[in-house]
Amino acid sequence: MIFNPTVASITLRSALGRRRALLYAIPPLILIGVSAILRLTSPADPSWPARVLGEFGFSVVLPLTALIIGTSVLGAEVDDGSVVHLLATPVPRRTIITTKFTVAVVVTMVFAALPELLAGLIATGPRLALGMFAGALAASVIYNALFVCLSTATSRALAAGLCYVLIWEGVLANLVGGARILSIGHYGLAIASSIAHDPALKPGVGLATACVLGAIVTAGTLAAAVRRLGSFSLRGETA
């Protein structure tokens, strides 16, 4: 069994509680707002939708949302020691990771992928919107696998993840061509571009490369997270 409804329910309540949903909503609301403003002020410019939804959406909004959600579904329990309650139950470590990962992906899709769809519909129409939505769905999966793994590796997962998002995804992947092959944002853009066929998207990798590397990153980071969680003792420390 790779999904535990009880763990999922507790994780979902925690993820959406304590006003966290408002925090998740801020970046996508900015994306939708910017798209609406540009639609009104620059309706004749065909280049801005792909730039805003692609560069800003996939390099800033999506990874930041996934970072906050992905590191919180397990990281908070590791930090405060309450993870020992999970480790003391008969629920397998693999099931804990996959369940929390699934919840993180679903919440990220709601707060990041759906806003990409809405912003795309506002900006141009269904073709670009569907492409961005599909790319955002795929990127949500890969990003959350990475950030859930990161939360098992360090108590400063949010800070480490923020450095990754800002430096690697936000700067290097958009300025250095070779860095794009290891950019989750560009994996999502490749999928979006294959559907939208918008030359302004400019993904740094091809569709096949994005799918293969995305699958490898997802499987590898989840496997590492399971192994790392399995090294915790019942005191919440690594063995």
Explain the meaning of each model-derived region.
Residues C149, I216-A239:
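Junction motif at the cytosolic side of a transmembrane helix
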